[in-house]
Amino acid sequence: MRDPRDIIKRPVITERSMEMMAEKKYTFDVDVKANKTEVKDAVEAIFGVEVEKVNIMNYKPKAKRVGRHAGFTNRRRKAIVKLTADSKEIEIFQGV
């Protein structure tokens, strides 16, 4: 099994993700090879909360150019984690 800190990369702080916190939904960038079960176990291990549901979205790389040089951005995977009703809040999102 992989280390939970290798699965969860960083929290996603956007206007929409802050609104979803009222529904106990938290958004994270996760490893592109992680599945829902691994994300659930990682969030529970790192933050000590109970996870009810995990939704995962894949983002394709975008084509970018700088002068004559063309390339692509990295592909991403984003997870929206819904906590149970009796679970505590995640502290890293407080005060943002």
From Swiss-Prot:
Does the keyword section mention Ribonucleoprotein? yes
Give the record's keywords alphabetically: Ribonucleoprotein, Ribosomal protein, RNA-binding, rRNA-binding
Q: Is Methyltransferase tagged as a keyword?
A: no
Pfam family example for this protein? Ribosomal_L23
For this entry, list what GO says about its biological process. Answer: translation
Record-level GO cellular component terms = ribonucleoprotein complex; ribosome
| Source organism superkingdom | Bacteria
Q: Which SUPFAM superfamilies match?
A: Ribosomal proteins S24e, L23 and L15e
Molecular-function annotations in GO: rRNA binding; structural constituent of ribosome
Q: What does this protein do?
A: One of the early assembly proteins it binds 23S rRNA. One of the proteins that surrounds the polypeptide exit tunnel on the outside of the ribosome. Forms the main docking site for trigger factor binding to the ribosome.
- Give the similarity note: Belongs to the universal ribosomal protein uL23 family.
Q: How does it assemble?
A: Part of the 50S ribosomal subunit. Contacts protein L29, and trigger factor when it is bound to the ribosome.
- The molecule here is called Large ribosomal subunit protein uL23
- The organism is Bacillus cytotoxicus (strain DSM 22905 / CIP 110041 / 391-98 / NVH 391-98)
The opening ranks of the lineage are: Bacteria, Bacillati, Bacillota, Bacilli, Bacillales
Q: Which gene encodes it?
A: rplW
